[in-house]
Regions:
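A contiguous, low-structure linker/loop signature
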Residues: 2-56, 75-79
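Short intrinsically disordered, low-complexity coil segments enriched in acidic
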Residues: 1-6, 163-167
Length: 167
């Protein structure tokens, strides 16, 4: 839970610290996946320092904007849904893709701990939003693949991610 802030801006790109604390470079004049260049969580020690940031609290949402968007969409008869990234997609924003993939293979218990914290946060966030708004649906997205295949084995998915996706 970090405020998004601009670190550097040029005519070609903007570098920001994004909401999970990661440093991202976004190109202005071309379409590209943001280039993530640094992460606050680099190992178990920095994970333990970071972990409390994945606790639910009322400041996680911009309630005024959420209410305005909700009411405007509702007045237009739109399909209203709660949506968030979960699992691999969220974890790569916290520790980075390369570090995450290596840890899936070499330190799965660490990744399970991060998944547990992330899942608890998303469940609490969903419950909080459902206590205030009425949704027509829910969408939990998780991008675990690259072009032609998954980023890790089905066995790793079953062992590490599936138990938390079920929750």
């Amino acid at each position: 839970q970090f405020p998004v802030r601009i670190i550097e801006e040029t005519e070609e790109y903007t570098i920001i610290q994004a909401s999970y604390g990661e440093t991202r470079k976004n190109w202005k004049n071309r379409i590209s996946t943001p280039e993530c260049t640094d992460f606050l969580v680099k190992d178990r020690k920095t994970w333990e320092e970071y972990k409390p940031r994945l606790s639910m609290n009322k400041t996680r949402f911009d309630w005024v904007t959420a209410r305005n968007v909700y009411e405007r969409a509702k007045s237009k008869g739109r399909f209203l849904y709660f949506s968030c990234g979960v699992g691999y997609d969220m974890l790569q924003a916290i520790i980075g893709s390369e570090r995450l993939l290596i840890a899936i293979a070499e330190e799965p218990e660490w990744i399970r701990d991060i998944m547990k914290s992330a899942t608890e946060l998303l469940i609490a966030a969903g419950e909080e939003m459902l206590s205030v708004f009425k949704f027509d649906g829910v969408f939990y997205g998780d991008d675990m693949g690259y072009r032609n295949a998954s980023l890790f084995s089905p066995a790793a998915y079953k062992e590490i991610f599936f138990p938390y996706h079920k929750k």
